[in-house]
């Protein structure tokens, strides 16, 4: 599950942190050293923590749990949308609306509105309206879709949240903490791991690194679902042995 080696992480640039002057001292245990005023993350720490996080995501998926993928900065959006969709998990890739979790009842109202508009567009209702009315409703639908398309099939709060860049997504992390929703997150050298349940110390800017984290999480979900769908169920779900992985 989530079969990633240290070489894969090196090639993706997972070990490159931020400039040393922007560091967060709480990340000191995960830093190997510095090179050209850039902190270098210790992949011997990252790899087992990454595997632990992926095993957790897999266990949740095996039990039918929902993991909300969150990454709204430009370098993360595409991978968040594609990998969450690939494994059938909800996602937020555009903008985190304040209250998306803590005020989920209101958000559900917006989701209902979006689904109503989509149904009207589909059944020809828009064609019976004036051009101005149809344009107004189309714009409303597009706006709602940008923000809510990834969570429109999420009927309740997620069981966990997988975050790329806890600094950029601090509001999402705060809401999850407030509701007791476990947070799995990539934490770079400029952020604090304090609010995160499953810390993955790593580069949160490089597209290749972001793709590695997200494809690993999607694979963990899909493999867990496949294992539990087979006769024998949960017994077939195999967690990754970090020691074996480090040999890669």
Swiss-Prot record:
GO terms for biological process: translation. The keyword Kinase does not apply. SUPFAM superfamilies: Ribosomal protein S2. Pfam families: Ribosomal_S2 (PF00318). Disulfide bonds: none annotated. It comes from the Bacteria. One of its GO terms (molecular function) is structural constituent of ribosome. One of its GO terms (cellular component) is cytosolic small ribosomal subunit. InterPro entries: Ribosomal_uS2, Ribosomal_uS2_bac/mit/plastid, Ribosomal_uS2_CS, Ribosomal_uS2_flav_dom_sf. The keyword Ribonucleoprotein applies. Keywords: Ribonucleoprotein, Ribosomal protein. PROSITE patterns: RIBOSOMAL_S2_1, RIBOSOMAL_S2_2. Belongs to the universal ribosomal protein uS2 family. PANTHER family: 30S RIBOSOMAL PROTEIN S2 PROKARYOTIC AND ORGANELLAR, SMALL RIBOSOMAL SUBUNIT PROTEIN US2M. This is Small ribosomal subunit protein uS2. It comes from Alkalilimnicola ehrlichii (strain ATCC BAA-1101 / DSM 17681 / MLHE-1).
